Curated annotation (Swiss-Prot):
GO terms for cellular component: cytosol. It catalyses: (S)-2,3,4,5-tetrahydrodipicolinate + NAD(+) + H2O = (2S,4S)-4-hydroxy-2,3,4,5-tetrahydrodipicolinate + NADH + H(+); (S)-2,3,4,5-tetrahydrodipicolinate + NADP(+) + H2O = (2S,4S)-4-hydroxy-2,3,4,5-tetrahydrodipicolinate + NADPH + H(+). Keywords: Amino-acid biosynthesis, Cytoplasm, Diaminopimelate biosynthesis, Lysine biosynthesis, NAD, NADP, Oxidoreductase. GO terms for biological process: diaminopimelate biosynthetic process; lysine biosynthetic process via diaminopimelate. The gene is dapB. It comes from Chlamydia trachomatis serovar A (strain ATCC VR-571B / DSM 19440 / HAR-13). PROSITE patterns: DAPB. This is 4-hydroxy-tetrahydrodipicolinate reductase. One of its GO terms (molecular function) is oxidoreductase activity, acting on CH or CH2 groups, NAD or NADP as acceptor. The active site is at 144 (proton donor/acceptor), 148 (proton donor).
Length: 253
């Protein structure tokens, strides 16, 4: 039996349903046979966040840090599986604490970037970080559309964390590497990330460029299918963790 055939139809609530990602996800979900669009929320909608939580089976959030924080307050009262695609949280916002608390009851998937290419780039960057000595300088450049609020992007921060972790594992005695990071907001660029390892005699570059936001909605649908089809246990997940299981199946399965 195919996964899709074994899934009971679920109601999906989109938070941020009139935004760039919300519109794409609305179009994509309308074509999925095993789920249907329930009530959604945007700043202009007449539906309350509480209604969206109580009247849907699964929530997908691409809104703003402020709205996400309020959404989590309602989810802690009425737990539902949730995919969080919003970025730009500050350390003192309390969102991380709320996510951790919610994950005690339901699966919580936090994804700064749902593109498979972004996951592969991070894997390659971590691998390269282990090979290139600390004498190599590291730089991350990211570019997004002018309306994106957070800079540096969540994806760039995640890349830096992966590189630092890999360096710490391979060069324990060396100080934590300095990673130069730059962000640009230009036009309607969907997303570009470039990681450079620069030595005295060479430069190694890993670049990922997104041409269409459809790649992000496709990644969200993969995550959604994993939640619905495999009965993902309660816990805190990232898109990397779920892609890692897919990677293991493709390469070693």
């Amino acid at each position: 039996m195919r996964v899709a055939d074994s899934i009971m139809k679920k109601s999906i609530g989109l938070v941020g349903d009139t935004g760039r990602m919300g519109v794409l996800l609305t179009q994509a979900l309308l074509c999925r046979p095993h789920c249907f669009l329930g009530k959604g929320f945007s700043r202009r909608s007449q539906t309350s966040l509480e209604e969206v939580v109580t009247e849907n089976d699964i929530l997908i959030d691409f809104s703003s840090p402020e709205v996400t924080s309020l959404l989590l307050d309602f989810l802690l009262k009425t737990p539902r599986p949730v995919i969080i695609g919003t970025t730009g949280f500050t350390n003192d916002s309390g969102v991380k604490t709320k996510l951790s608390a919610l994950s005690e009851y339901v699966p919580v998937v936090v994804c700064a970037n749902t593109s498979l290419g972004a996951y592969v780039q991070k894997r390659l960057a971590a691998f390269a970080a282990k090979l290139f000595s600390t004498s190599y300088d590291v730089r991350i450049l990211e570019t997004h559309h002018r309306a994106k609020a957070d800079a540096i992007s969540g994806t760039a921060i995640s890349l830096a964390e992966a590189i630092r972790s890999a360096k710490a594992e391979s060069y324990e005695e060396e100080p934590e590497p300095f990673i130069e990071m730059h962000g640009s907001r230009l036009g309607n660029v969907c997303g570009e990330h470039e990681v450079s390892f620069v030595g005295e005699d060479e430069r190694f570059v890993i670049r990922h460029e997104v041409f269409s936001r459809r790649v992000f909605s496709g990644g969200v649908l993969l995550i959604l299918e994993k939640i619905m089809g495999e009965g993902l246990p309660k816990g805190y997940y990232t898109s990397d963790v779920l892609y890692e299981s897919l990677f293991q199946e493709k390469v070693f399965g």
